[in-house]
Amino acid sequence: MLTSPVRPSPYRLLLIVLISVLTGCATSPTGRTQFILISPDAAILESEAAYLDTVRQLDEEDKLVSDPLTVARVARITGRLVSIAVRDFPESGDWKWSVAIVDDTETVNAWCMAGGRMAVYTGLFDQLELTDDEFAQIMGHEISHALANHTAERMSRAMATAAGVAVIGAASDNSGAAMAGASLIANVALTLPNSSDAENEADVMGMVLATK
């Protein structure tokens, strides 16, 4: 007699999700409660892989800036911020801090991933004509996202959504499609925007970094 494959009970999956939600709480440097399901170290590993792929592609497209004056300016300002970050957050002393300068005058952007991997787009300077202090405030904000584990927070939101999709799929006997959707969500986790709470927190922390 043929038997159907055993699939997970939707109630068991729901229980796992609920336990994860209840136990996945941490406290940010400003005292804010964070929903985090992934360890900071795991977030750093994922971020490092994504960063190296991005930089490799930019290098192949000849989009990395090598102008000595620009490189020196960015290195001087980010270097000062990193030294303050390491002093105030000693665990970040083990990070592989680095910064890539992207030759893209149309893009006004900068970011810092978990683990201290940074990128700065030349549109920041060409379009905004930033002073050193203004640039320091922007990078202080971006570095604060990494210090406050905002990458892990974003990834956790995606993981929770993926788990919810899996529960729905199991309950509707469509687990294959559910897991495919969960995988897709996990893959785009690093590109999700930060929450408004995280942005406000980075504003506060970044201002402190930039003014020390």
Place the predicted regions along the sequence by residue:
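Sec-dependent bacterial lipoprotein signal peptides
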Residues: 1-25
